[in-house]
Amino acid sequence: MGDVVADALEKLSADQIEQFRKYFNMFDKEGKGYIRATQVGQILRTMGQAFEERDLKQLIKEFDADGSGEIEFEEFAAMVANFVVNNENDEGLEEELREAFRLYDKEGNGYINVSDLRDILRALDDNVSEEELDEMIAEIDADGSGTVDFDEFMEMMSGE
């Protein structure tokens, strides 16, 4: 088992591994111990996991290095972990950012003004210059409204 697979499996709980095994077995009907690489997307959809087709293709390429098209359970679990663990982390990050946003959105009107944003950015990095702050704020508040809504805030904080 490669390092990439071992590292990914370490991040999974016993419950997650058991769940992945059930889905894997649903598609490995003959008990061969592997599934076709082309089935991974179907399984992710069955699990209700969102994914980008290009990300999936890249992972399959990474885990099916010999190009055989056969994915064993450990490889499958490691691949799926990339989607499940990342999605859970994204949800946690979004909730944390939403909470931080609410702290600065004192009136509860769905936006914060750029002076509050300046305070947030300065708190995150006290070495940032006024010029750098101006540049960051201009980029974040692209429409020049003087306010930042949650989506703009989320994009800035998560880099997405």
UniProtKB/Swiss-Prot annotation:
Tissue specificity: Pharyngeal muscle.
Coiled coil, from the record: none
Pfam families, per the entry: EF-hand_7
Keyword S-adenosyl-L-methionine appears in the UniProt entry: no
Keyword Ion transport on entry: no
Residues that coordinate or bind Ca(2+) 2: 141, 143, 145, 147, 152
One Gene Ontology cellular component annotation held by this UniProt entry: centrosome
Similarity annotation: Belongs to the troponin C family.
Protein name (database record): Troponin C, isoform 2
Gene source species: Caenorhabditis elegans
Gene that this polypeptide is encoded by: tnc-2
